[in-house]
A protein has these predicted regions:
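A short, compositionally biased domain-edge/stem linker segment
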Residues: 27-34
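Positively charged n-region of N-terminal signal peptides that target proteins for export
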Residues: 1-4
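Hydrophobic helical h-region of N-terminal Sec-dependent signal peptides
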Residues: 6-10
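Glycine-rich catalytic cores of cysteine/serine-nucleophile enzymes that process amide/ester linkages
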Residues: 21-26, 38-114
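Generic ordered-secondary-structure signal
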Residues: 36, 76, 86, 133-141
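Active-site nucleophile-His-acid catalytic modules used for acyl/amide transfer and hydrolysis
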Residues: 101-146
Length: 146
């Protein structure tokens, strides 16, 4: 029984090691976001993709993308833990035409999509919430809030 336990732990541990390299993992668009060049309505979308490496067994990385009416780009908001280790804020904000990129090899799923006047009304509330996010400069995987 002891040998079986050691074998199972070894297999589990080795399978947790990935041959994927975050530097070469796909970050291309999944093709599920509306093109801001042709979609003029306001848009709010929330995406989730498996976290990188073994973390993907237990967690997803989520991010919010907002595009005000007639905007040429989306603003993406996400919390990224590795940024804190480099002296940067965990909260990341950037502009893009493709908010639906793979999360280091993991294809995102769109878990919320809202367009039109309702989205336009909520975007300022999201921007305000982001600007007041209390954990913008810190990150803890467990127990959260990130």
């Amino acid at each position: 029984m002891k040998t079986l336990c050691i074998l199972l732990v070894s297999v589990f541990s080795l399978s947790a090691c990935t041959t994927k390299d975050w530097r070469t993992a796909s970050r291309e668009s999944a093709g599920i976001a509306a093109d801001p060049a042709t979609e003029k309505q306001a848009i709010i979308e929330v995406y989730a993709a498996d976290a990188f490496s073994w973390r993907g067994w237990f967690a997803v990385h989520t991010w919010i993308a907002v595009k005000p009416e007639n905007a040429a780009t989306y603003t993406v908001y996400e919390v990224v833990g590795w940024r804190v280790k480099r002296g940067l804020p965990a909260l990341r904000e950037y502009q893009t035409t493709t908010p639906d990129t793979y999360w280091y090899g993991a294809r995102p799923e769109k878990i919320l999509s809202m367009k039109g006047p309702k989205a336009a009304k909520l975007i300022p509330d999201i921007q305000k919430a982001v600007s007041h996010y209390p954990w913008a400069n810190e990150y803890t995987l467990f127990p959260g809030p990130n």
